[in-house]
Amino acid sequence: MNFFPWLTIIVVLPIFAGSVIFFLPHRGNRVIRWYTICICILELLLTTYAFCYHFQFDDPLIQLVEDYKWINFFAFHWRLGIDGLSIGPILLTGFITTLATLAARPVTRDSRLFHFLMLAMYSGQIGSFSSRDLLLFFIMWEFELIPVYLLLSIWGGKRRLYSATNFILYTAGGSIFLLMGVLGVGLYGSNEPTLNFETSVNQSYPVALEIIFYIGFFIAFAVKSPIIPLHTWLPDTHGEAHYSTCMLLAGILLKMGAYGLIRINMELLPHAHSIFSPWLVIVGTIQIIYAASTSPGQRNLKKRIAYSSVSHMGFILIGIGSITDTGLNGAILQIISHGFIGAALFFLAGTSYDRIRLVYLDEMGGIAIPMPKIFTMFTSFSMASLALPGMSGFVAELIVFFGIITSQKYLLMPKILITFVMAIGMILTPIYSLSMLRQMFYGYKLFNAPNSYVFDSGPRELFVSISIFLPVIGIGMYPDFVLSLSVDKVEVILSNFFYR
């Protein structure tokens, strides 16, 4: 057993190193920017080293466990650990945050605070994915909301205060339900609170109480995912945020909600999940159709991409609701896949805006000729978003399809109906993706503009785009990169379910 506190170092390094930013010499933004990038790279290398040399990939149990007593009064422990379910999101967080920091080069106003908030958000997200104590999970969940709110309200667009307030009201409202669920689970059946996740997993609850806990946790995670009808904060938030913030929102923040559904609703409350799983599948199916049919009506480019995130979340819900190892593995693969694709689309939307200063699709047109590199990368990631074979989105959606078809929980006719509606959603997705490309890159509008000369993608934008594109292609060609991490853990989670 390895007793070195790898996870504690990985969690606290970004925020402590970020605090040093305020004491760096005043020599322009270059020093701050490179210092932040170096911290992110060091963190990613540390994480990769710890996982490669100290994590047993064929062991479904919690590994790299750290347990330190923190507050005696409430039996509160600093308890961290990882398994096959959390290792993928943690590596995704490190990768996307490093590239988002590189993408934030145009930010010059209050650069110290901006980069500190990105590193603080990094710590909160890693802490959420590696927490093995329910109260610590809640604290980390709340902690990373503060940097997001400040990043939105200070460096956003014209309606940034409205979107930031909308975001914090929704997420804080959901967090009330999360806190009630955590305290309810921790205080049940004992005079002393038991917030240890392993103890709570082995605890049995009355069905009525388990359903109440399940609904509370579900509301909290539905806001963050987002799941309709609690998704209305998302388009405004993405529409106003700086694109480096959008990369973190789409790539990591939304995935925390899906992770919470699997980690707590599914693993901690299996009986209630078995009852509610048909509703998850129904909501997921509606979500695919709703978002795919609403997206073409969005004039704002970033809002249209935001609705595609809502549509992709529908596949994750169906995978979670299928209660099969195939479906759940597909949902986990979709979490990782869309983390890359969503971050890349928002990055390219932001770099396009930096050049043409247009955000409404009906004002764009003809960008493909002056910006061929951005056109190529945008087209490639749009194809990945609409699940083109050979890319990660296709494999994830296909595995979810097989998961729901092979599920023993549902009768044949409901499965055929759900599959049919999912197929309609997959047909609608190319419509809004390809129409977005047509409005942006084809036609002649840009040539009629007074300042029609624009620069194409530079080395920085090309490096970020290719860095995200390689894993999208890699996972599409060889999905076992991700599936091999989670397959053993998925079997353990599903061993608690009974088809009754």
Curated annotation (Swiss-Prot):
Catalytic activity: a plastoquinone + NADH + (n+1) H(+)(in) = a plastoquinol + NAD(+) + n H(+)(out); a plastoquinone + NADPH + (n+1) H(+)(in) = a plastoquinol + NADP(+) + n H(+)(out)
Main location: plastid
EC number from the UniProt entry: 7.1.1.-
GO CC annotation terms, alphabetical: chloroplast thylakoid membrane
MF annotations from Gene Ontology: NADH dehydrogenase (ubiquinone) activity; ubiquinone binding
Keyword flag Membrane: yes
Subcellular location: Plastid, Chloroplast thylakoid membrane
TM region(s), chain numbering: 3-23, 37-57, 84-104, 111-129, 134-154, 167-187, 208-228, 242-262, 272-292, 305-325, 330-350, 386-406, 416-436, 462-482
InterPro entries assigned: NADH_Q_OxRdtase_chain4, NADH_Q_OxRdtase_chainM/4, NADH_UbQ_OxRdtase, ND/Mrp_TM
Gene Ontology BP terms: ATP synthesis coupled electron transport; electron transport coupled proton transport
Topology within the bilayer: Multi-pass membrane protein
Stated name of the protein: NAD(P)H-quinone oxidoreductase chain 4, chloroplastic
Name of the gene encoding the protein in the UniProt record: ndhD
